[in-house]
Amino acid sequence: MKRKLFTGGIAVMLCLAMSGNAQQKATSYTEKENMAVKTRLNFNNRADFEDAHRGFIATLEDEAIKNENGSVSYPLNAWKFLEGEAPATANPSLWRQSQLNAIHGLFEVVPGAIYQVRGFDLANITFVRTDHGWIIIDATTSEASALAGYRLVKQHLGDLPVRALIITHPHIDHYGGMDAICREVSNKDMKIIVPKGFYEEALSENVMAGTAMGRRDSYMYGLLLPRHAGGNIGTGLGTTNSRGKSMLVRPTDEIETTGERRVIDGLEMEFMFVPEAEAPVEMMIWFPKYKAFCAAEEITHTMHNLLTLRGAKVRNGLLWSKYIDDVIARYGNDVEVTFSLHHWPTWGNEKINTYWAAQRDMYRYLHDQTLRMANQGLTPNEIAEQLVLPVGLDSLFACRGYYGSLSHNVKSQYQMYFGWFDGNPANLNPLPPVELGRKYVEAIGGGERVIEVARKAYDEGEYRWCATLLNNLVFAEPENQTARQLLADVYTQLGYQAESGPWRNFYLTGAKELRGEINRQVPNLVNASSVSNLGADMLLDFCAIQVNGMKAGDKRICINLTFKDCGEKAMLLLNNGALNHRMGYTDASALLSLQVTRNDFARLILKEVRP
């Protein structure tokens, strides 16, 4: 079976957190805010903890999962500080979710049939019994965590042949370890089943926007933060990504419609194709023999992102809710267990249907109420400030904003319909941050006056207003250490109060950067190895975004290009600062004709070699 590999390397290239100052204490306002959370939610409900521990078989005794070179891939025991009551430096609701996510090991989901390894990475790896072997669902972020999970299964459940590897969607925490699984299994007949468009989407997301997304990733997942009660306590969707080698493998089979069935070694599966919701392409799986439903990442124990803070395409809350309703209609009468590729399973037909319905209603509500209020003339910021979930949803832990948030999800649905402009003429052509900051500071009466007003706001617990004041001052006077330190203190308190893991991580990472505790160099997540796996057409699109159009605006250059490794030809035309191409065309008047492999071309445009 011919395979092409994609070296993601995302986790390897991200900087480790630098040692910082002593942990900042929570202010009385933050303590009060976090104490109030305990009165709003039923922390005596321990059902999730019972489900998260149910079926436990074994876990690794090691302190960490390690890469081949001895470096830490995933710190298994780094989350022990989460034991006990939430401190004042953490939102108790997020702390509870993080405790659940930190539970790790091999678990039985359906006796003798379905097993999960959880807590070895951000996402789970699932094993489903066929007549004579296994189907593996998803492969975590990296080689080390995927192999650790697979070897734990072999140790406790036997060394059975793997008949198929299913990857539910093209996010790296689900496919990064797939090549390692393929090599470990060494079964040339093993099927690799993915949703249609998986390979292209995996490449495009991690390459086309990889550099900017990589830096935002490091903020969102708290990769630059220490793991303690004043730092990274998890993402809400899981703990954190493993670090190490990640490779993409070409699939052998694609699912493109709902209702498609496959029988692998005697086990029947029915697929639901659910694109443009949690991921550009994704699929869920029904196992009729086991009355078990794999919800991929469409139904989880959190309010998910309708627009992820790391950056991606907006997700359609209406479509998402309809997919879940279709799940209920198709399988609600028969299901006995539902499991996802994050978090823990849910058992029992009635309990599952209640859980599914709440998730469906939550996404529908966010979508519909955003549009209702937009049609009444409210801006996205106003909607996000005013909208609340109904009590029946708001009181459910599975509908809390641990990963997404009501605030930024509402803004995403507004953006999906109306774009970035809120309709206020003042926001049509605003000043850029530095110029705005300078005029803002001047209008208030200078930097010292801004700090005076900001300190008063800080002392009164008005952290959002304080952040606005100081953000403008830092843009106006980036070397003003008093402003930077105070803004870092503000971000820290906002992080301590945040129920969303990504919000907390963004705030606390921003605080570290303001204090000078982070290497500000942008991680380079794109290299020739990854880029050269793009198809020729997408590779040339990637080439085009490397062009500085403002410098090339007066140039007109035509080049004929032949890729020797795949045989494809293209005509490239640089004109008016834009680089267009036509696949399969040549131009007799071209300045030059070039024959090159995709790898050498990628190295050339990434300046890894000189022309």
Locate each region found by the language model.
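Feature captures hydrophobic
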Residues: 453-456, 462-468, 472-479, 484, ...
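TPR-adjacent "capping" and linker segments in tetratricopeptide-repeat scaffold/adaptor proteins
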Residues: 358, 426-450
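Acidic/polar short surface loop at catalytic or gating sites that assists cofactor/ion binding
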Residues: 68-88, 197-247
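N-terminal pre-domain segments of enzymes
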Residues: 23-98, 102-103, 324
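Metallo-beta-lactamase
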Residues: 133-135, 141-144, 243, 247-253, ...
